[in-house]
């Protein structure tokens, strides 16, 4: 073999003849043959090969440490016969890389260092030929056990030093060291020895032993070693290294006495040592094939299972949806030429097809049945309020149950509350069942319809059902005649026909109706019945016998009285067929359609109105009644004369009324609100029109104002002529049919003025409520009416909080709140000022009649009243200051001004006499001259009889005298009762609470009405503050008259314009007159319509101040203190200011959404309160003046609580008809409730 000779590399430190020292080499350098020492460290040798080592015969020391050696070739060291020391520490040599012949030629080897390698086991065959080995270092490896074969078969009789430290040795065999008899030093430290037999007794030469840093377990198995160690350390020649570290592990409780191995004995050892031996074998790592396969199989199975589950769920949903769709098609679709019940079994490929689709997401698409020449659309418009009762649920359940049955001809289908109601009867085809015209003819606006079917007494209790159905106009002129001659199926179809045949019709949708913008262009397919006509008397008789046929209904639709589900808000969204597709289709299918001329369309509209009027549930005909009889008319009969029906005059029984007619006579007069799209002639308009809320009709045909004023009293009806507006008109529920409702007290209808009509054009959601006084009313009750609002559904939660939290709610307050409410059904009228049953909504301008009745009432009651009236009168003046100017700083800007503004302007428009205006603007609470004006208005009240007023006064005064002895006690407790009764009246809206709520309401009426009579608007003033604060925004002009707002509470926004100048004025009579004049001038500048209003108001205010001056002087004579006088003066002053504010915003009121019709009742109440102040006499005694202030402070003590409850509900805007204008209007003032001490201070101190 050639010897490779190379020069000494640069990395070699020493290159001599005997020694070669290199580092960081990747190979073994070719040293000279004479080299005795070869040291190569910190290199990168992966293996030891025979190259350049086989010829180093003289080599005695070979050091290859820290080179990363992993493999040693079998013959790499065979030429080193003279090698004595072999250093291979800090490498990666494993047990498998050493064979039995690796060290076989090293006969002279004495020191073998294999420290810090990867040795796991020891085999004695490695050292078979190394008999001269004296030092063996195996520390820092991974040796786990020493068995008998570890050194067995070796010839290491010369071995003196054995280092096995820092390994993983946990087991040592009993004869492991027997082949090594000459051992002198043994190091077994830093291992995992817990149990070890006595292996050191054969080693007689042992002088150094190290056993520390192990995990000794002091059991009885370790007792032999402990005994050896105790004997071993007795000799001074023996050394036990780190004997103090031979501690037992705290594994058992038995070692408490033997904490060290040296102290372990038979007495303190633990005999219950675990009897097992952990033997770690050197085996190659198994591939995780089975585990991976198992995991793969499990994962695949799980994925397949989840996929299958998802498919099953999807399939189930799909089938369920198809089943629902199929059910919808079966139930709502049929061809027009077949019986109604026969469509369930027919094939869908027969003549004609239906494309209706009724889903469960409250959505009804256009349901049209297209035959050879007929189509019928059924539409359901969006509705904000849909309260389902038990009848709808029962009908829906019966409808589904009847799916599988075919009961013959005569079944009826219509949609109600988001459900498709189905009614059948098994009568013969000749006996047609009348359809529920009250539901089908309801024009677009949701109505409270009571008892669509009159049930038998034992079956179902009266339920309230609210449904939203679109009434569409008929097209052919003879539909009205044929309507009741056709079967119920054709009846249902024709009642929902659209007014055009094959033309795109755009209903007049106004700008604020954003919800209908996507549906401006709508195409409707109309159809006409193909059934022959029957005589006219026949269909009228069918309508009369409609309720009777319902009792005999054999279909069992109403057998289940309990509702299965209750959906409070169930809106329906209509999806319409595109215009282009229908035009193409209709051109293809029906090219010979006849277009109706304009006279025919008008005639159709007239017939539709007549039909609607006949079938309406609450129609009341007053055309044949006298003027005095109209006020007490009964809504149980409807008489209508149709010119097209040969003047058939038949009494139609309202389907809503299910009780005997005798009970109807005792109930209060019902308010009928009829919504008809168009009346084409003046005669029908005079009969049917009462209130216009849409400019569409006004654009179509403008009726002269004189015609309206002359004919408007003919009928107490309300019209909503917009076809797709979200305006809802709610009729009054009768007390007999709804025992839980309160009775009504009604006022006669008033004329429609120019101002109100102008406001009606602007405000699309204005609604008029006409009430009338009833002679038979034992209690004064109010039934809440809902004002048609666009956003009322969003305001329902706020209303509920407001009504439940307000401690001083009264009837008038709830009246206003309930107009924007959805769910309120009634409220008590306990806090009616002066017990006047007729002081209720008064939207129309002509208020002379109402004022007269109120004045006459108050005048007669004045005679029997005690001093409490005078006390409360002072309280009312201050309360009017506080609530009108402080509690509600923006009260007069929008709402309260409606009354003053519209009345003032309307009286000017109608040329009402100055006496009425003086009565209207009388501001002094103690001006007796105004009382005469109230009596002068007797001439304006021709429809009210004195007997009615006296009868009601008599009842109320009798209960009033019973309450006079509880003056202050009743004053503090009655508002709480009002809150409880009102809350109960709202919370007990459910049908199961009818009786309880009725009893509570009656008790409340009998006790609270007389109390409020004697206390004169005490609760009324507090209740008016709630709606005003909640919805009225403060205009900038209100700051012109905050003079007396300092009297009790401070107005936060009152210091905008004129508070500085007015506060600087001293409080005397001249200053007050000057202030009123200034206010009048400012209002005169603001009013563009009428300058005479402001001047007249200034004159009236001066007259009032004169009366106050007289009263002040008279009070000084009686010796009353100054604070009482100033209190009264500020009361009159602030009352005048509040009244003036009503005029300041009159120009703004007409341009804003909230016209007087939106909140007619509150405006009337504000005006009536002023009349109460005008009517009350002026008491001269100083005692009464003092009592007034005392009563005022007592009442003011709980006003902060009321203020807090009002302030909590500031975010509620109850009538946001035009939300854009409401948001862009003046900023809302923030009210800060006064503290208790500030509220109870005297007016002088506060000022």
Curated annotation (Swiss-Prot):
<feature type="repeat" description="LRR 1">
    <location>
        <begin position="34"/>
        <end position="55"/>
    </location>
</feature>
<feature type="repeat" description="LRR 7">
    <location>
        <begin position="182"/>
        <end position="203"/>
    </location>
</feature>
<keyword id="KW-0812">Transmembrane</keyword>
<feature type="domain" description="LRRCT">
    <location>
        <begin position="214"/>
        <end position="271"/>
    </location>
</feature>
<dbReference type="InterPro" id="IPR050541">
    <property type="entry name" value="LRR_TM_domain-containing"/>
</dbReference>
<feature type="transmembrane region" description="Helical">
    <location>
        <begin position="294"/>
        <end position="314"/>
    </location>
</feature>
<feature type="region of interest" description="Disordered">
    <location>
        <begin position="887"/>
        <end position="927"/>
    </location>
</feature>
<keyword id="KW-0472">Membrane</keyword>
<feature type="repeat" description="LRR 6">
    <location>
        <begin position="158"/>
        <end position="179"/>
    </location>
</feature>
<protein>
    <recommendedName>
        <fullName>Leucine-rich repeat-containing protein 53</fullName>
    </recommendedName>
</protein>
<dbReference type="InterPro" id="IPR001611">
    <property type="entry name" value="Leu-rich_rpt"/>
</dbReference>
<feature type="region of interest" description="Disordered">
    <location>
        <begin position="828"/>
        <end position="866"/>
    </location>
</feature>
<keyword id="KW-0433">Leucine-rich repeat</keyword>
<feature type="repeat" description="LRR 4">
    <location>
        <begin position="108"/>
        <end position="129"/>
    </location>
</feature>
<dbReference type="InterPro" id="IPR003591">
    <property type="entry name" value="Leu-rich_rpt_typical-subtyp"/>
</dbReference>
<dbReference type="InterPro" id="IPR032675">
    <property type="entry name" value="LRR_dom_sf"/>
</dbReference>
<keyword id="KW-1133">Transmembrane helix</keyword>
<feature type="repeat" description="LRR 2">
    <location>
        <begin position="58"/>
        <end position="79"/>
    </location>
</feature>
<feature type="compositionally biased region" description="Polar residues">
    <location>
        <begin position="898"/>
        <end position="927"/>
    </location>
</feature>
<feature type="compositionally biased region" description="Polar residues">
    <location>
        <begin position="1238"/>
        <end position="1247"/>
    </location>
</feature>
<dbReference type="Pfam" id="PF13855">
    <property type="entry name" value="LRR_8"/>
</dbReference>
<feature type="repeat" description="LRR 5">
    <location>
        <begin position="132"/>
        <end position="153"/>
    </location>
</feature>
<dbReference type="GO" id="GO:0005886">
    <property type="term" value="C:plasma membrane"/>
</dbReference>
<feature type="region of interest" description="Disordered">
    <location>
        <begin position="1223"/>
        <end position="1247"/>
    </location>
</feature>
<keyword id="KW-0677">Repeat</keyword>
<feature type="repeat" description="LRR 3">
    <location>
        <begin position="82"/>
        <end position="102"/>
    </location>
</feature>
